[in-house]
Amino acid sequence: MAPPSLPCGIYAPTMTFFHPESEDIDIPTIKHHAQRLAKAGLAGLVVMGSNGEAVHCTRDEKIAVLSATREALDAAGFQSVPVLFGATEGSVRGTIELCKLAAAAGAAAALVLPPSYYRAQTDEASIEAYFVAVADASPIPLVLYNYPGAVSGIDMDSDLLIRLAQHKNIVGTKFTCGNTGKLTRVALATDAKTPFRDGSGYMAFGGMCDFTLQTLVSGGSGIIAGGANVMPKLCVKVWDSYSQGNRDEAEKLQKVLSRGDWPLTKAAIAGTKSAIQTYYGYGGYPRRPLKRLEQARVSAIEEGIREAMEIEKTL
């Protein structure tokens, strides 16, 4: 039986919050953040992705964050909001083990990068074999994660993604590559789910909120975007406006969203946490070796997203 389809819409790859001095995981803040995002109307959450500092966390910490997020959503009445889990490890065996742990902790699907540490020995055939082996054994479906910047430049093309989509336990791709042409080809070939029709249920996710509208036009299913940690309601408004036929409003708001997302993109994890701290009173810092931002940079981010946040406050 095919796995249940994920809902269309905006997903946030949530931050992992740490105590500022000890760098221990801050579970109460993680739970608070998950509930705030769900209340803002997000379709789903992703934990232990790139924004979640997965590479800075142990396996036990990863599962603790997943469990806390699922518990927080359930406690607040958001049992239907799915949580995806970044389950990438370097080996087939390790990734399968992590998928099994994630399933037991309540993950709806696993977000998985291609293997990349041994880049010189990693070709397309080995990448395809890796995903097939993991998908064969994982108790939860896979969403493939195409993010060349995180995997030594490996950029899976549409032909490979379309072939992998034929596996019954591979249910989507996140296109952090930003290639809307590739997203369009994959969405078309897989009959991807959209706000207008269920199609096959395959999910073609844009990977940044600055091309939310472009993803919709391309036949996409949703957005998994770091900016949704900061301006979730604006992200949802762009998505809903287009989906409900108000294209002019969607275009207008997308321009604001694209401008506001850029300062966050440039400042990455530290910048997003800084913006959350400025506007919501929590956030803190990344784990080392990522640097803490100087006050001048914090102020610049605050100013850079001001227009977007003024709209966010009205929604």
From Swiss-Prot:
The keyword Cytoplasm does not apply. Substrate binds at S50, N51. Its EC number is 4.1.2.54. It comes from the Eukaryota. InterPro entries: Aldolase_TIM, DapA-like. Disruption phenotype: Cells are unable to grow on D-galacturonate. The active site is at K174. SUPFAM superfamilies: Aldolase. PANTHER family: DIHYDRODIPICOLINATE SYNTHASE (PTHR12128), DIHYDRODIPICOLINATE SYNTHETASE FAMILY PROTEIN (AFU_ORTHOLOGUE AFUA_3G11920) (PTHR12128:SF24). Mediates the conversion of 2-dehydro-3-deoxy-L-galactonate to pyruvate and L-glyceraldehyde in D-galacturonate catabolic process. This is L-threo-3-deoxy-hexylosonate aldolase. It comes from Hypocrea jecorina (Trichoderma reesei).
